[in-house]
């Protein structure tokens, strides 16, 4: 249930940006979440609504964009899609993969006033 602490961190970022950028209300938050980030989107949405009550982000829409997991295969040099850590390369069968996408958790865009 680390989604609660993630939402608290997101709110902290929103409050800091509000002070530096001068906005007073958040209408929409768009997050990029990698497929390997171990984040449950529905739990994140639930906790976001709870954490933002009474704040500048209360009632804002949380949009989640899932980033597919991709890796680079060291032996064959191919960029491949993976479903989880330690998957084998679909091209050569090697497990020597370096993840290059899918671990993200970042605020991609805000709609504010």
Curated annotation (Swiss-Prot):
Alphabetized Pfam families for the sequence: HypA
Entry GO MF terms: nickel cation binding; zinc ion binding
Alphabetical GO biological process terms: protein maturation; protein modification process
Keywords: Metal-binding, Nickel, Zinc
Gene3D superfamilies tied to this protein: 3.30.2320.80
Highest taxon of the lineage: Bacteria
Binding site for Ni(2+): 2
Cytoplasm among keywords: no
Binding-site residues for Zn(2+), renumbered to this chain: 73, 76, 89, 92
PANTHER family (UniProt xref): HYDROGENASE MATURATION FACTOR HYPA
Protein task: Involved in the maturation of [NiFe] hydrogenases. Required for nickel insertion into the metal center of the hydrogenase.
Assigned protein family: Belongs to the HypA/HybF family.
Protein name: Hydrogenase maturation factor HypA
Organism: Acidithiobacillus ferrooxidans (strain ATCC 23270 / DSM 14882 / CIP 104768 / NCIMB 8455) (Ferrobacillus ferrooxidans (strain ATCC 23270))
